[in-house]
Amino acid sequence: AKLGKGQTLKLGVTYLIPPVKKKGPASVTTAGSAAKKENTGKKQPPRKTERNEPLFGKLLANVKVTSNRLAGACFYVVSGHGGPDPGAIGRVGKHELHEDEYAYDIALRLARNLMQEGAEVHIIIQDAKDGIRDDAYLSNSKRETCMGAPIPLNQVQRLQQRCDKINALYRNDRKKYKYCRAIFIHVDSRSKGKQTDVFFYHSNRRAESKKLANRMKDTFESKYGKHQPNRGFTGTVSGRNLYVLTRAIPVSVFVELGNIQNSLDQKRLVIPSNRQALANWLMEGFLKDYKGM
């Protein structure tokens, strides 16, 4: 409707009057308030609390991350031999104990422990079928691969293959993780009458490798004192120019888990809870080394 002369209102005409807008101070957005608004509007993604690793087997494939004690750490877990090479062979009655099968089972248990502590873990030697096994006598096979690649029969080629795989992964991992370590797990074979313990070998060229081996040994020594006080621990630490220790780029340790041909050490291997204990202690050794960086 139109207004009258002098912008006056006319009688009998209905007018729509808009509401009065209240004047207030201009809205000022500071960096702090913007950040506050962003933080309250969008939650940060939570730390990964569960992982899936089919290599552990159907029952144990889902891994709950229960701690962040090894967050920021990356590991390369390598079980010895595998594929066409069973490694050392022990015997209990009619059963053959193949080194590669027992080393692999302990390696899987260690890898799972490390994942539970928040670490990134690469399992270098793999068997798509085995998983973590609670059998005393582990069935033997030649299925193992080096992360999917067939394992060569030639020893030097076999060792170089796993070092190449570790080094390729490490070149990328070292940009993301402040602590990268490799472990090579074996089961020593000596004459049947000689009982052995757990032995740790380090690179002669790396001070960090020696520190890691000593911290592993200290961990095992304290565990033996607690769980087997009457037996004592006679394992040692020594430097070795082993092929994998000289050619793997990340700091590494080489572990011999007893004597597969000795009846007492065989118990350490065939009893599943003992294999788990070895894996637990290896993990605690890594934890001690990580804290002492």
Question: Can you name each region flagged by the protein language model?
Answer:
Residues C74-V78, E120-I125, C180-I185, F199-Y201, ...:
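Structural recognition of the beta-strand scaffold that forms the well-ordered cores
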Residues E50-K165, D188-S191:
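Active-site histidine-acidic residue metal-binding/catalytic motifs
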Residues R162-Y177:
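Short, well-structured alpha-helical segments in soluble
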Residues D173, D188-S191, F200-S203, H227-M293:
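Active-site-adjacent mobile loop/cap segments within catalytic or ligand-binding domains
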Residues K10, D100-L108, R112-Q116, D164, ...:
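Solvent-exposed, polar/charged alpha-helical surfaces in well-ordered, non-transmembrane soluble domains
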Residues A1-A34:
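Extracellular LysM carbohydrate-binding repeats and other cell-envelope/extracellular binding modules
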Residues P86-L97, D188-R215, F220:
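A short, glycine/acidic-enriched catalytic loop
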Residues K23-V63, T234-G235:
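Short coil-to-helix leader/linker segments, especially the first N-terminal amphipathic alpha-helix
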